[in-house]
Every structure is written in structure tokens, then in C-alpha cells.
Amino acid sequence: MLILDRLLTGLHDACAAFPDKRKGAGDYSMADIGLSAFSLFFMQSESFLSYQRSLEEGRKTSNCHTLFGMAKIPTDNHIRSMLDPVHPSHLQSSFDQVVATLREKGGMKQFERLGGRTLIALDGTEYFWSQKLGCPHCQTRKRSNGKTEFYHAMLAATIVAPGHNMVVPLMPEFIAKPDGAGNRTASAMPPSAGLPRTPRA
């Protein structure tokens, strides 16, 4: 639990440093907004935040407070609105901290194979596509029916080891097209196109 608390503190600090497009003080801190998004992935439940808000209203506390140290729970729409402009690179320190903590505690030794080497698995994946919604940073493709699809993709890197049932995700590279070109390249995605946030439409 001490290691988890340390990692959550690092994530809290990274989220607190997110650029804030609001000109005045908002109802929710950027730390609470970022941690709310993280909690959805951590708990793997789309209804997690709405249920926690109902607990907060009835009991004045929730798992968001006790597990993630959040002060207030924003709505899903507010989370999307505030995180859209945040560049993924603001989370680099959180990914680095996971590896650094494992090295410090000797956890990386479990992943060493082939004479002390660390194996990294690479996988390209799409995390958004739509025939209705698109943005200037979307990749595009034509289907046989003539319709255009818009999509975002990334190259995911993960530390793995044969016979080990756990993996360590590294900072992904978001696949963006260069300005004025149609070819794809792995690079840091421009603002508003970074974090997985929108379901298929």
C-alpha cells in the first residue's frame, strides 16, 4: 500500500500540473479531474463515478476520497471538456515513476530474461474511430462503400517476461500525421487528441 500511495501521490502531482483553460477558480481542481479519469480505468467501470457521487451526496464520503484522495467528483462531461486540451506528455513523469519505483524496490529483476535483458512488447492499437466525428489530428481511411472513417491510433510499449503474469506499461506514442502529409508517424500527439475519452460513434 505504501508503494501505491507513493504512485498515487505522483499521479496527483502530475494531474495538478495539467494546464487549466479556465480563467478563474473552478469548482474542481485539475488534480481531481485527472484522478477521476484515472479511477474509471482503475476500477474498470463506466458507472463508477456516478455511483461515487451518489455516495458523496448521501454519506458525505466515497471511495474516490479514500482510495484516490480526491476532494470533489466532477461529472463525466466536465472531465472530457477539461482533459481534451491536455497534452499526453504531461503524464510522462507518472509512467517513469512506475519504472523507477520498481527498480528501487528490486521489482524489475522479475522481468529480466536472456542474461539480464528486459523484453518490451510493441503493439499498435486504435482507441477511437467514427464515421461521424473527426478532428484535425485524425487519421482517415476510405471504406469500400465510399464512407470516410476517422480514427486515432497509438503504439503501446509494455515490459513483459515469459512466465510472468504481470506487465509494466510504458508511455505510449500517439500516431499522428505530419502537417500537410497523409503518412502516419509515431510522435507526441498534438493537444486535444491525447487521452482515450470518446466511445465509437
Give names to the regions the model predicted.
Residues 10, 14-18, 54, 82-85, ...:
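Residues that form generic nucleotide/phosphate-binding pockets
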Residues 142-201:
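Electropositive, glycine- and tryptophan-enriched low-complexity nucleic-acid-binding patches
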Residues 48-50, 62-74, 91-95, 109-110, ...:
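Short, flexible active-site-proximal loops enriched in glycine and acidic residues
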Residues 3-74:
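Gly/serine-rich nucleotide phosphate-binding loop at the start of the catalytic core
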Residues 51-58, 93-106, 185-191:
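Short, motif-level signal for alpha-helix interfacial/capping segments enriched in acidic residues
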Residues 80-164:
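Active-site-proximal, Lys/Arg-enriched surface segment
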